[in-house]
């Protein structure tokens, strides 16, 4: 079964972009999924992913943006799930492309944060976040017990930059150190849907919201049922206690010990055990009595039963 995160990423790889946005997205993809190697005195870049659609996206962006020779390799993992691993290999103009994408400086030292030149425009900010999500992002299926979206970064500076970029859209993202790197994450459902909208995953957003609405409605119904059940149990418990106290009084000293108004209620409760307090109030001979009035008289009967259990003498008033 395809995961919600995989479906979201597949949708993102089909989006059309402006040229400036292509550069921002590609920079995030290469920075986060790329690795460098030297062979025969030549620098090459391998961009690795387990998602075929993302591999095609990287391949297309490199060919379109730089008109270079790009190799696409497929390998199978031998451990765990044994998924295919797709490697997009760039074997020419590697240094120039890394510099153009603001991943390395002229002296070939790495730039750990996000260059402002890449994200001057709002559309480019969105595209960089899209590339970062494609490269290192994950999002829980909204049907699971908790909402969670995160983007993993190897370096703290870059992770902090992603967090700052996300919070420029008022997403209230937070950072956390993991064993092998850092993450920027969202826990609020509303913020996750906002993020999906920002990066252009509109179909995923609609699916997320549909599932969330159904889930929240189901939870509301469950809470209502639980509340009603608790109230019903409380009502049943009170009725059983009242009947037991009335029987105790009757068997110990007789119901005649009770004042007339209390005795009538005691007899009604004993004879009509399944009726509600409202229905009891409608049965009283002297005229209708409210639920609170019936409850007050039943509490007095409870008090008399407790006094009898404690060995006190109860006289008819």
Curated annotation (Swiss-Prot):
Keyword Cell cycle: yes
SUPFAM superfamilies referenced in this protein's UniProt entry, alphabetically: Homing endonucleases (SSF55608)
Keywords: Cell cycle, Cell division, DNA-binding
InterPro entries the record matches: Homing_endonucl, Sporu_reg_WhiA_N_dom, Sporulation_regulator_WhiA, Sporulation_regulator_WhiA_C, WhiA_LAGLIDADG_dom
Keyword Methyltransferase attached: no
Gene Ontology MF terms in the entry: DNA binding
Pfam families: HTH_WhiA, LAGLIDADG_WhiA, WhiA_N
GO biological process: cell division; regulation of sporulation
Residues annotated to bind DNA: 276-310
Protein family per UniProt: Belongs to the WhiA family.
Function: Involved in cell division and chromosome segregation.
Name assigned to this protein: Probable cell division protein WhiA
Biological source species: Bacillus thuringiensis (strain Al Hakam)
């Amino acid at each position: 079964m395809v995961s919600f995160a995989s479906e979201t990423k597949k949708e993102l790889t089909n989006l059309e972009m402006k040229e400036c946005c292509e550069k921002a997205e590609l920079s995030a993809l290469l920075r986060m999924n790329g690795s460098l190697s030297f062979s025969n005195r030549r620098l090459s870049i391998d961009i690795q992913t387990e998602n075929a659609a993302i591999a095609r996206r990287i391949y297309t962006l490199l060919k379109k943006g730089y008109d270079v020779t790009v190799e696409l390799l497929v390998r199978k993992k031998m451990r765990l799930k044994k998924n295919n691993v797709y490697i997009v290999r760039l074997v020419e103009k590697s240094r120039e492309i890394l510099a153009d994408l603001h991943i390395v400086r002229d002296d070939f030292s790495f730039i750990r944060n996000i260059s402002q030149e890449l994200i001057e425009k709002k559309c480019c900010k969105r595209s960089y976040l899209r590339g970062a999500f494609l490269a290192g992002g994950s999002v829980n299926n909204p049907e699971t017990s908790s909402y969670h979206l995160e983007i993993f970064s190897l370096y703290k500076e870059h992770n902090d930059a992603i967090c700052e970029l996300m919070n420029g859209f008022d997403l209230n993202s937070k950072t956390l150190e993991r064993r092998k790197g850092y993450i920027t994450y969202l826990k609020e459902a509303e913020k996750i849907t906002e993020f999906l909208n920002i990066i252009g995953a509109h179909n995923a957003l609609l699916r997320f919201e549909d599932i969330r609405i159904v889930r929240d409605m189901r939870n509301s119904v469950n809470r209502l049922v639980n509340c009603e059940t608790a109230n019903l149990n409380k009502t049943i418990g009170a009725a059983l206690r009242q009947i037991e106290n009335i029987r105790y009084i009757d068997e110990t000293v007789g119901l005649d010990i009770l004042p007339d108004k209390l005795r009538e209620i005691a007899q009604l409760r004993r004879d009509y055990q399944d009726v509600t307090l409202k229905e009891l109030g409608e049965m009283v001979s002297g005229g209708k009595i409210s639920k609170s009035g019936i409850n007050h008289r039943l509490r007095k009967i409870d008090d008399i039963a407790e006094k009898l259990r404690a060995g006190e003498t109860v006289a008819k008033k």
